[in-house]
Amino acid sequence: MRAARTARPLASVLLALGVLAAGPATGQELPSFRLEMKNGRFEPTEIVVPANTRFKLVLHNAGTDAEEFESLELKKEKVLAPGASSFVVFAPLKPGRYRFFGEFHPDTAQGHIVAR
């Protein structure tokens, strides 16, 4: 009988720790924005996102050559083969303008993420 009384509080504590370790389950999708790469250019060249909010940038390379999304300021880099799609998740950004470019076509593949 004594073992049963001890086991219940222990089970409750373990359950509570498991719930806390799992983190919040909001069930909400991240705001998502799309960037297309094609023939050494990005479309759109400016992406406006909500400031102080995590978001996802969906990348698609519609061109015939590999292309890279890179932002030194945001410390993000992703290379995509022709026809490939991927995504990058960004931590909340402070209001501002953040440059990105394609390293394979740095003169033409340029743009900005604007957090407002």
Where are the predicted features?
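Bacterial N-terminal signal peptides that target proteins for export
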Residues: 2-13
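Bacterial N-terminal signal peptides
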Residues: 11-21
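Sec/Tat signal peptide C-region and signal peptidase I cleavage site
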Residues: 23-27
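Extracellular/periplasmic metallocenter environments
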Residues: 28-34, 41, 80-116
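Structural beta-strand segments of beta-rich domains
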Residues: 45, 53-57
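Short beta-strand/loop motifs in extracellular/secreted proteins, especially
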Residues: 55, 65-67, 109
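Asparagine-centered strand-capping/turn motif at beta-strand->loop junctions
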Residues: 59-61
